[in-house]
Every structure is written in structure tokens, then in C-alpha cells.
């Protein structure tokens, strides 16, 4: 059995880690390098850095922060946010990222997924999906630009397309659950997992350790992303893992 992973997510804006609720009301959490070191020592299995200002404001890739962090990390680092080209990916990998996460640019140019997968290997390419449920159309749609713009691309169609193009992993954020701490969108995540064979990282809604037990018990996703509950020190990575183990689920 593949052991489940717990992955802290650091949303970085203007060089600082921030967190909001449903992608709004951002508040300052701290220095990304310091927080990365804290989670590295606290038992995190991987880290995700999302530069949420990059797509919206178009500033340069945060290469210095990534290099400082990666040089001291002993766990894999995934970096996303505003990656537009193969050259961007090359720079990030050269500065210490282990994987890159593509979202808006992949929706705009799906062939970027194939090109990146062919050049760097699919294990390096994670596709981030900000999933919004539109009650009027009764379907989940992909959003871009940090969750601010909704597309007409349906999530269930998109996940199958990106797998065929060479994505090695999906990072799925349920926008309606983001920061709410009321549990993951189990039904939605289970449906996505039934459509693809690549690993899925679930994001949005993890409010306590039991939510992660439910996630891994009721879906076959590979990892759970956590932000608010860890940043606010409501719990720790090890505490979450201990509860998961008590639930009879193998975790790293």
C-alpha cells in the first residue's frame, strides 16, 4: 500500500506567506523560508509554494526564496504560480524546485503540459486545478488567476485531458471549501480519482485531523494539503499523522 502524504501549502504574495478564506481576505502568516524550515523539521512529507501574486500581477519568479529554501530542505518542494513557459520551469528546477505546478498557463495552452512532460519528465509536472461549483449550471469549472476568473472548462473533462497530455500529478483545490475548515469535498475528489490514474493531492477544507482520516478512508487520493490549521498552530503535521494511523491508514 502506498503511504499517504501530508503536505503544508505556503501561499506566497509579495515575498510573504499569506492565507485567506475562499481565496479572499489574505492575512500575513510569516517568512516563507522560516516556515518551510519549520515544516521540514515538523515531519511534512513535501512542501508546496504557490506564488499567488505572480499570475495576477506578473512579477518575476521568486527564485531567490526558492533557492534559499531548497538548499536547506530534505523533502520535495513543488512550486507554482504564474509559470508561463518551458524557460520558467527550467529556472525553477535549476533553483531547487523538485516539481512545478501549472494552472492558468496550462488552461490557456494545454500543449505546455506535453512539452514540459516530454522535456523534464512527467514526475516533475503537477497540474493545479482551482475547482468552482456553479450551482446554476450544476457543474464544476476550472478557475484561473488565483481563483478570480472562471473558465468554461469543466473539471471532469480537464483532468482526463491533462493526464493524456503527460501530467504526473493533480493538485485539486475545492474553492468552496478553501479555508472553511469543515472537511474536504469528498464526493468531488472521489469522482476525479475515478477518472484518472495519476496521484491526486486534495486541497481545501482540512480543519482537523479527522477530516484527513475521512479523506483517505473515503477516497483514493494520495495526499492531503493543509494550510490554515498548520499556520495557525491549531495542530501539527505529526498530530494529524498520528490520528490517521489510529484510523488504520498507512501514512509516511
Swiss-Prot record:
User: Where mainly found?
Assistant: cytoplasm
Name the active site residues.
11, 130
As one GO molecular function, the record gives: imidazoleglycerol-phosphate synthase activity
Sorted alphabetically, which CDD domains does this protein's record hold? HisF
Q: What are the entry keywords?
A: Amino-acid biosynthesis, Cytoplasm, Histidine biosynthesis, Lyase
Question: Which SUPFAM superfamilies would you find in this protein's record?
Answer: Ribulose-phoshate binding barrel
Reactions mediated catalytically: 5-[(5-phospho-1-deoxy-D-ribulos-1-ylimino)methylamino]-1-(5-phospho-beta-D-ribosyl)imidazole-4-carboxamide + L-glutamine = D-erythro-1-(imidazol-4-yl)glycerol 3-phosphate + 5-amino-1-(5-phospho-beta-D-ribosyl)imidazole-4-carboxamide + L-glutamate + H(+)
One of this protein's Pfam families, by short name?
A: His_biosynth
User: Can you name a GO cellular component term?
Assistant: cytoplasm
| Compartment list | Cytoplasm
Report the pathway entry. Answer: Amino-acid biosynthesis; L-histidine biosynthesis; L-histidine from 5-phospho-alpha-D-ribose 1-diphosphate: step 5/9
The EC number(s) attached to this protein equal 4.3.2.10
Task: From the UniProt record, give one GO term of the biological process aspect.
Answer: L-histidine biosynthetic process
**What enzyme category does the UniProt record give?**
lyase
Q: What family is reported?
A: Belongs to the HisA/HisF family.
How it assembles, according to the record, is:
Heterodimer of HisH and HisF.
Role this protein plays: IGPS catalyzes the conversion of PRFAR and glutamine to IGP, AICAR and glutamate. The HisF subunit catalyzes the cyclization activity that produces IGP and AICAR from PRFAR using the ammonia provided by the HisH subunit.
Official protein name in the record: Imidazole glycerol phosphate synthase subunit HisF
